[in-house]
């Protein structure tokens, strides 16, 4: 769209949706996955969001206490406003989503938040 090339060695995790901007149909290869990773402080939150199909996981890193991350899990089809955290009712699904999230973070070479000693805090399955 802007006519700018992608720098060598730069990972692009996305797909061309130019057609949608022009009023066209959704791409045939549309993915039902979405990763948003923010390993920096923003109002106290360091987080990764992983959506796969109807499920959405939000993983909160805790640089002050890295051994104590938090997670929330939603079924967006049944709960589009994210009112009901299912992470304790569906721990198997929460762990599955965390494993998928870790795989995608590793695949894209994502940076992890660091603790106050500068040590990376990778997500853990719990």
Residue map of PLM features:
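C-terminal cap/loop subdomain of S1 sulfatases and analogous C-terminal strand-loop tails that border
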Residues: 2-76, 126
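Long, internal low-complexity/basic segments
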Residues: 52, 62-63, 67-70, 76-126
């Amino acid at each position: 769209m802007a006519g700018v090339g992608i720098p060598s060695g730069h990972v692009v995790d996305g797909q061309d949706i130019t057609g949608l901007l022009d009023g066209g149909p959704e791409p045939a290869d549309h993915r039902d996955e979405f990763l948003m990773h923010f390993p920096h402080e923003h109002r106290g939150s360091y987080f990764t969001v992983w959506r796969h199909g109807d499920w959405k996981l939000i993983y909160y890193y805790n640089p002050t206490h890295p051994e104590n991350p938090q997670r929330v899990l939603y079924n967006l089809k049944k709960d589009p406003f994210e009112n009901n955290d299912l992470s304790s009712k569906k721990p198997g699904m929460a762990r599955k989503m965390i494993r998928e999230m870790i795989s995608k973070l590793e695949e894209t070479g994502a940076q992890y938040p660091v603790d106050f000693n500068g040590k990376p805090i990778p997500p853990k399955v719990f």
